[in-house]
């Protein structure tokens, strides 16, 4: 009996030992109890963004190749249709924009839901920065999706955009498409809420969403909406903050 118990203990310990989570990134469905846990989840979201189907390659290739800024020579990667406009409905290259974008949104929504539960239970942790980053990232994801799958804002804002999903959904959920106008309204709301939660300073680590990241995205979103005064005001806030400097000459290998 002692050997049986010892064996069971050994196997249990081994399973626990092997089933370790990464310390620098994680899935939002895991346990979140502290600000540090929330940041690990945000790291995981940002890691997911680097997929080749999103910011790791295809998002940039899609726009630049279609705009004539570059030509794709490498064959066999499924990217030829980017510049030939020869799309097919069963190409995984294009569905990746949708699936990766909504995967990132799911992670953000789950994180925000977990934080809300912690706050309601009386947690003393200050999740303001984590929530601000998460809302800013969700705005970015929806901005990317509506630009890819919806018409330009002032061309037909009442036309279909993408589903506005702001909470975790079950696997069988079938959210309906919102209008382009509703998408942009959600984007601006997330940016406004996010900016109010972020400290008005530059993050110490490059690559993370901070207050000025949020304001820069506001400028870009408003530019796409042809709200030129709003875009200018947001851009001016960053320029006049003294935190960043404009590049006088943007050249490779580094701007000057």
Predicted regions and their residues:
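Membrane-proximal, proline-rich intrinsically disordered regions
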Residues: 14-61
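Conserved small/polar residues in nucleotide/adenosyl-binding loops
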Residues: 16, 250-255
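Conserved, well-structured interaction surfaces
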Residues: 78-149, 195-200
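Inward-facing hydrophobic residues that define packing positions of alpha-helical scaffold repeats
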Residues: 105-108, 184, 191, 235
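Short coil/linker segments at helix-helix boundaries
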Residues: 125, 148-181, 185
């Amino acid at each position: 009996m002692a050997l049986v118990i010892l064996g069971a203990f050994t196997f249990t310990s081994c399973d626990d030992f092997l089933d370790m989570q990464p310390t620098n990134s994680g899935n939002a469905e895991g346990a979140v109890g502290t600000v540090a846990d929330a940041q690990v989840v945000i790291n995981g979201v940002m890691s997911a963004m680097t997929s080749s189907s999103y910011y790791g390659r295809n998002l940039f290739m899609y726009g630049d190749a279609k705009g004539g800024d570059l030509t794709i020579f490498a064959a066999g990667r499924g990217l030829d249709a980017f510049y030939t406009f020869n799309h097919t409905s069963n190409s995984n290259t294009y569905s990746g924009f949708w699936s990766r974008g909504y995967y990132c949104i799911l992670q953000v929504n789950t994180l925000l839901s977990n934080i809300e539960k912690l706050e309601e239970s009386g947690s003393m942790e200050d999740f303001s920065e984590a929530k601000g980053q998460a809302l800013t990232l969700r705005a970015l994801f929806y901005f990317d999706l509506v630009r890819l799958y919806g018409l330009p804002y002032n061309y037909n804002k009442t036309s279909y955009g993408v589903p506005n999903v702001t909470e975790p959904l079950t696997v069988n959920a079938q959210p309906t498409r919102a209008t382009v106008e509703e998408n942009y309204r959600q984007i601006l709301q997330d940016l406004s809420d996010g900016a109010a939660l972020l400290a008005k300073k530059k993050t110490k680590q490059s690559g993370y969403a901070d207050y000025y990241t949020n304001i820069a995205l506001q400028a870009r979103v408003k530019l796409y909406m042809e709200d030129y005064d709003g875009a200018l005001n947001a851009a001016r806030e960053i320029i006049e903050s003294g935190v960043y400097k404009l590049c006088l000459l943007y050249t490779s290998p580094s701007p000057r």
